[in-house]
Amino acid sequence: MLVPIEWLNDYIDIDVSDEEFCDRMIMSGSNLETCEHFCEEMERVVVGKIEKIEKHPDADKLVVCQINIGEEEPIQIVTGAPNVFEGALVPVALHKSRIPGPLHGQPKQEGGVKITKGKLRGVESFGMLCSAGELGFDDKVVPVAHKDGIWILEEEYPLGQDFAEALQLKQAVVDFEITPNRPDCLAMVGMAREASATFKKPFSYPDTAIQKEDGEGESKDYVSVEIKNPESCKRYVARVITDVKVEQSPWWLQKRLMYAGMRPINNIVDITNFVMLEYGQPLHAFDINQVKGGKIIVENAKDGEMFTTLDGTERTLTDDMLLIKDAERGIAIAGVMGGLNSEIEEDTKTIIVESANFAGSSVRTTSKKLGLRTEASARFEKGIDPNLCEAAADRVCRLIELTGAGKVCKGSVDNYPVPEEAKTIDIRVDRINRVLGIELERQEMVDILKSLEIKVAGSGNIMTVTPPTIRQDLLEEEDYIEEVARIYGYDKMPVTLPKGNTEAGIPEDRALRDLTRDSLCGMGLNEIQTYSFVSPKGVDYIRTAEGSWERNFVKLINPLGEENSVMRTVLMPNMMEVLARNYTRNIDKVNAFEIGNTFVNNTQEDDVLPYEQYALCIGMYGKDEDFYSLKGVVEELFRVLGIKDPIFAGEADLGAFHPGRCARISVISGENGEPVQLGVMGEVHPDVAEQYGMEGVRIYCCELMFDAIRDNSDRTILYTPLPKYPSTSRDIALLVEENLEVGRIEALIRKEGGRILENVKLFDVYRGKQVEEGKKSVAFTLTYRDKDKTLTDEDVAKVHNKVLEALEHKLNAVLREM
């Protein structure tokens, strides 16, 4: 936000140096970027008048001008400017003068550019006629009338007077960085309020008192306003101006816009921009002859609707974009830019002034989709107080009246369905002092809060505070504590050291996550991090069932757009996006994982906190990867985390995964012996892969819940002496049904093997010519050992045969010859 000090003085008397002003504003919490002093490098540049113009004898594109600078004799200057004419008042850089620059087509020089007399194609020139750019103004703020050529003055000034003095060009402009939570400071009035509190001086609001409403009729006679989407348009105020004269703005108005970073266009547009900078409330003016039927209708555009904006670009709209329409067509994209079909022209005689409030989320979505960001959209995106609309509209009318640009009709058309009200809360004097570590009297706090236009009631320790509706950031007691702290002065806070003992240590949850990261990175996986704000369409892409908990989203109040409008409930959609992004960049193998928060709104109530927990998602693809690659990673991770005897139970359909190639992962709880689900894993469903542009690619994913892992993790290391007695192994190959899970076979073997069965290891799964259809062969190595003696063949055979009998009778497993 560019704040010219001269302009700020209209609202508050700044009687300190520019340096002190900046220092004190910083100490009261304002983030200051730069303080630039304009035209400090300008010397010996005066106001001159072109008395006579002659053609250059030796150059078609040059002319020789005789310039009256208030002395006895005119001076001669040769120029190639196309817009000079006899009688024009212009800035004249004399011999040995200095201008800020840069000269046309040259880079800017530190310390400015020195101008001396010389000859141009044989004709003497005793100085230079200057453009606005050569006097230090950026091209983007140069008035349209002076964009090409020499700066032609519209008003009379004494000839020979110092140019910077005549036009009051030497002044300071402070650039403040405005944080997203303080949209009220994107306005001169907002910065005046901050300065008032900082310097303990009163400030005044702009004059909005219209002296004569002498336009023909009333505003309601010309226009009606209908809001069809009150969620996206909270208020719409329209005022009508007749007998409009579209012309250049007076210099004082142009100058303020230029120093604030905006290009002057014409008096009507300039006044609306001026008031936007004053109040932070964007405004727009329509030519009433182009508003069909005298109707203003605020509603969403139709999907695919075409609309041409003021910049001449035809744009395709979608049905989530808010449009201002008349009785027949769209005339403006709400909060972003007006339409070419209702633009103010030189012959416009009657206008409608729009002062409306559009929802930040709606404007942000529209602006982002169209790739069109304007001063108006930047303000609406951050949130604007609907109560500004009327004052801003009246201020426009007052300036039109003051500049003679038109006649104001009586009244306004104000559609305000649900008036905005401030939130009143109680704050405590003792808590403010306790948090800040100071001892302020109650009255000091009251004075500070009132200087920010916060109403204070109550008595004793309790202060009942009501902020102005423009301060949408003041919601909790802590917000008011911050206000007291910054206006009191951070530099006045006593420096103290923390007291008490601090116990070092890492919480168990974090230690578990850190161990998981180390383990997975050690296995060659790469960690990724993605946004918690996601699109609700993500769960559709992974084939999540309707009504499932994964669809219980936490919705953002002020999202960046639909693709970032909810908090994620699962990590898999984000993982799929990352895998797809790598795949499209010809990365032939990816093994990745993410550990992040998920948020589930189980109650669907806005005032109840969502269930939040950490989750782990593993994703991989590549020619060497398969289901068992992923399972091996998960099993090794469980070993490190102390998850004993995990169960991988095959599932026919888990939505996101390939039917028959996925499993639920669980573990038997030590508390009640019931299975506890840890997560799911498997090969990603082909339809899901296709959604992400990976058609035909075999992708493997796993998602685990950290709460369940933490509750069932036992990383206690118990001492076990090295075995004294040897082990013996038996290999078995079993012919079983195709759909029989290996986990069930292993569980039965462990159960029947008893205490001497030390280990069971699967080493082969075979399907082929020697195995009949519908069957598979699975082979295990069984290791036996007794800690108290050396096992005999009879000891082993007794237990081993018991295992085989159980497999045959309970699972119909047939022993194959090895």
Name each model feature, range by range.
Residues M1-E216, I352, G371, E375, ...:
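Phosphate-backbone binding interfaces of nucleic-acid-interacting proteins
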Residues L2-L8, K170-T179, K234-T242, E375-G383, ...:
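Short, hydrophobic beta-strand segments
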Residues I5, D23, V63, F203-M306:
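Glycine/proline-enriched, intrinsically flexible loops and inter-domain linkers
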Residues V47-I77, L159, K255, N266, ...:
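Conserved mixed alpha/beta core segments that line enzyme active sites in large multi-domain catalysts
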Residues R121-C130, E134-G136, A164-E165, A172, ...:
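Mobile "lid/hinge" segments at catalytic clefts and subdomain interfaces of large enzymes
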Residues F199-I227, G404-I432, I438-E439:
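Terminal amphipathic helices with adjacent charged low-complexity linkers/tails
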Residues I425-V429, N433-K589, T783-R785, L791, ...:
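Extended, well-folded interaction surfaces typified by the phenylalanyl-tRNA synthetase beta subunit core
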Residues R434, S451-A457, E477, V539, ...:
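A carboxyl-terminal module marker
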